[in-house]
Amino acid sequence: MSAPHSALQAELDAAQSPYLAFRGIGKSFPGVLALDDISFTCQAGQIHALMGENGAGKSTLLKILSGNYTPTQGEIHIKGKAVNFTNTTDALDAGVAIIYQELHLVPEMTVAENIYLGQLPTKMGMVDRKLLRYESRIQLSHLGLDIDPDTPLKYLSIGQWQMVEIAKALARNAKIIAFDEPTSSLSAREIEQLFRVIRELRAEGRVILYVSHRMEEIFALSDAITVFKDGRYVRTFDDMTQVNNASLVQAMVGRNLGDIYGYQPREIGSERLTLQAVKAIGVASPISLTVHQGEIVGLFGLVGAGRSELLKGLFGDTKLTSGKLLLDGQPLTIRSPIDAISAGIMLCPEDRKADGIIPVHSVQDNINISARRKTLTAGCLINNRWEADNALLRIQSLNIKTPGPQQLIMNLSGGNQQKAILGRWLSEDMKVILLDEPTRGIDVGAKHEIYNVIYQLAKQGIAVLFASSDLPEVLGLADRIVVMREGAISGELDHEYATEEQALSLAMLRTPNIATNTASAVA
């Protein structure tokens, strides 16, 4: 075969092969096999989702693709040729860019400087500001953004930061762009803009890898889905008409969707927490409801319904402006979180990273931070033995996945951080647990574990009041669903009869119509 013909054949073969291929990728750390023989392919002009529980190996694979990690075994092929990335520069030069959840930008620098960071245009040994602005405007225009390139990044929104990160990738002519949980901090409008840009990048023939726990995003965007479990490849769905929530969950966790909530009936006791015409800051109307011992009550509503504000008021984070609280039939006054904790009322907040954990402290410290006030020695010294034993007990009983009690909690997954917060309150004399978006940002498998913990608390007679914007979660978990709209209760549904249609109808009613029964709640 002649040399020109061989070259032509090689070019044709490359054109017909997948743009990106993972061939037997493995990655080991001391004592841990993070990835085991991962093989799948991605096509140009395709949005390819990666799904799996936390710890399934998605992020590790992206770090190998970006040059942050070197695989223990296997190869990555781009356009039919094996590549070997020993650092991130190698990957960038090969046209690979990763848009991480924690954006890698410099707030004090301008938009233009961030876009061309590491490759600023120069003229006579100086940064060519005119060319920098010109080139930056081209990249921003490509994304449909009207932003002054000279604006310091710190003055932009998180959504705009993300667009700058994408512009930075395009400035390096990235043909493979991976997004790792990109919508976690975005508003609905910013998410819509991001999706528009991602679809445009697909139309340009780029390979898009997309990692998210949010199934609605996966189904809205993806052309194919590859599922990982415990560091291993499970399967690829390349026909989106043949996949649904149930089949995807089954592939991810090995359980049917109905098993995730695993509703557990139990004995409901007497009234534990009673709200009589209670108003809180951000809650427009007086709220009256009761949660019994061993009962799980879910608060559902659309954005602005007042669910989080009510829970914050009950915990003393914000002020209750009127009404009465009863705990086990006795009047209760709550002016601060200390009052609530002393009464046995605990809160797992909506934003666990900002309000629930102390990121730079250990798992042990985060579990013991509340109980510490009761366990100090006579000399006001920390009782290290008790704290170590208590932390180990909570880690084992809640199956918190951590290398050890001294691991920084910021290094744990969202599900394990949430379990550590629950472990903190198990050290208290808990009567009521308030949970605000208890499984937001948590993978399906960890959700199942959180639900089991909630059921166990309820079986111990603890009253559970939780707020969630995940309607299937509310319907699957709660004994009763209290629906709120614009700071008022618009209806109430019983677990046995509640449907998504009823709950959404109540959430969108224009006039509050308090209903106390089952299917008759919505006329």
Curated annotation (Swiss-Prot):
Alphabetically sorted, this entry's keywords are: ATP-binding, Cell inner membrane, Cell membrane, Membrane, Nucleotide-binding, Repeat, Sugar transport, Translocase, Transport
Q: Which GO terms describe its molecular function?
A: ABC-type L-arabinose transporter activity; ATP binding; ATP hydrolysis activity
Q: Which family does it belong to?
A: Belongs to the ABC transporter superfamily. Arabinose importer (TC 3.A.1.2.2) family.
Supply the PROSITE patterns for this chain: ABC_TRANSPORTER_1, ABC_TRANSPORTER_2, ARAG
Q: Which GO terms describe its cellular component?
A: plasma membrane
Q: Quote the protein name from its UniProt record.
A: Arabinose import ATP-binding protein AraG
Q: What does this protein do?
A: Part of the ABC transporter complex AraFGH involved in arabinose import. Responsible for energy coupling to the transport system.
EC id:
7.5.2.12
Q: Which residues form a coiled coil?
A: none
Query: Where in the numbering of this chain does the ABC transporter domain appear?
Result: 20-255, 268-511
Q: Decide whether keyword Membrane is in the record.
A: yes
Report residues binding ATP: 52-59
The entry's localization annotation reads:
Cell inner membrane
Q: How does it sit in the membrane?
A: Peripheral membrane protein
**Catalytic activity annotation:** L-arabinose(out) + ATP + H2O = L-arabinose(in) + ADP + phosphate + H(+)
Organism of origin: Yersinia pestis
Q: How does it assemble?
A: The complex is composed of two ATP-binding proteins (AraG), two transmembrane proteins (AraH) and a solute-binding protein (AraF).
